[in-house]
UniProtKB/Swiss-Prot annotation:
Protein name as annotated: Large ribosomal subunit protein uL13
Organism this protein belongs to: Citrifermentans bemidjiense (strain ATCC BAA-1014 / DSM 16622 / JCM 12645 / Bem) (Geobacter bemidjiensis)
Homology family: Belongs to the universal ribosomal protein uL13 family.
GO biological process: negative regulation of translation; translation
Assembly and interaction partners: Part of the 50S ribosomal subunit.
């Protein structure tokens, strides 16, 4: 029996809808990262983007366990002297809830060029509505 290797032209992509209302951030992010990579498919190939599209709604209602809202800190730098900026998870959830989930999923994807293509298939929305109804997304139970 020969090993099946997926080809870029033969990949079929589905759309999945995830409602993260009162779901724990890390547990949701791992499931989303696996679907974006295509690890849920029998044709998974590490060097080919075989993943599906994921639509996330209610990002502002995601839950963090413990004291992470106050203690977990995200850093960024402007490349200028003294340009280190830091923001806690609680403030980031208030200002940009989509960014909090995007950072968690990005950290769980491989660190290569393929990850940028995978991350483009992630669509995150704060409210319960999304503009992708025409794609007929399937519900992904997490």
């Amino acid at each position: 029996m020969k090993t099946q290797v997926a080809k870029k032209e033969e990949v079929t992509r589905d759309w999945y809808l995830v409602d993260v209302d009162n779901k724990v951030l890390g547990r949701v992010a791992t499931e989303i990262a696996n679907v974006l990579r295509g690890k849920n498919k029998p044709t998974f190939t590490p060097s080919v983007d075989t993943g599906d599209f994921v639509i996330v709604v209610n990002a502002e209602k995601i839950a963090l366990t413990g004291r992470k809202l106050a203690d977990k800190t995200y850093y960024s730098h402007s490349s200028y002297p003294g340009g280190l900026k830091e923001i806690t998870a609680g403030k980031l959830l208030d200002k940009k809830p989509e960014e909090l989930l995007k950072k968690a999923v990005k950290g769980m994807l491989p660190k290569n060029k393929l990850a940028r293509h995978m991350l483009k298939k992630l669509k995150i929305y704060s409210g319960g509505a999304h503009p992708h109804a025409a794609q007929n997304p399937k519900n992904l139970n997490i």
